[in-house]
Regions:
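Short, conserved charged micro-motifs
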Residues: 103-105, 142-149
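Conserved PLP phosphate-binding loop immediately N-terminal to the Schiff-base lysine helix
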Residues: 29
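Non-catalytic pre-domain segments flanking phosphatase-related domains
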Residues: 1-20
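Active-site phosphate-binding/coordination module
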Residues: 32-128
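A general structural motif
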Residues: 13-15, 47, 131
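Short beta-strand-to-loop capping motifs
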Residues: 136-140
Length: 149
């Protein structure tokens, strides 16, 4: 894929929305560089809608929707979306909020099954900030190498 700077000017003028991933794309090597963030500010200032799309948890998405120059954040691999509208956060979820408790029990049961098959696995450090998914630590903070995971 070519960088946006290589797009023809006419094509750039037709862009209305920029959707972007975080890990390994917008954020490199666990670092959000100032220049990258400033680029996002410039995109938004030029009237282009900005939407972050990530597998990261609801807690992270809430912060991004409040403080980042974005129109919306899609999080937990599409399970939820947060948008800032008139100074307030609008929260949408793929699943009905009424199903949250039963859904969580199902996920906890699935993780318990995984633990019997893979005793060394652990939940991701940010699991407590998640609403609709379970994240297994795949060498982010665990002692297990990514190859083993």
């Amino acid at each position: 894929m070519l960088p946006l700077s290589k797009m023809p000017v006419e094509a750039v003028r037709q862009v209305t929305t920029l959707m972007f991933d975080l890990d390994g794309t917008f954020v490199t090597e666990d670092n959000l560089e100032a220049e990258t963030y400033q680029s996002l500010e410039r995109v938004k200032e030029n009237g282009i809608k900005t939407i972050a799309v990530t597998g990261r948890p609801a807690g992270w998405c809430d912060l991004m929707a409040r403080w980042w120059p974005v129109d919306s954040v899609v999080g937990e691999n599409g399970a939820l979306a947060y948008s800032k509208k008139r100074g307030k956060i609008e929260r949408l979820s793929f699943h009905s909020p009424a199903d949250k408790v039963s859904y969580r029990k199902r996920l906890d049961s699935l993780f318990a099954d995984l633990l019997t098959k893979f005793p060394g696995i652990k939940l991701a450090a940010d699991q407590s900030f998640r609403q609709w998914d379970i994240a297994v630590d795949m060498a982010e903070e665990s002692e297990i190498s990514l190859q083993t995971a």
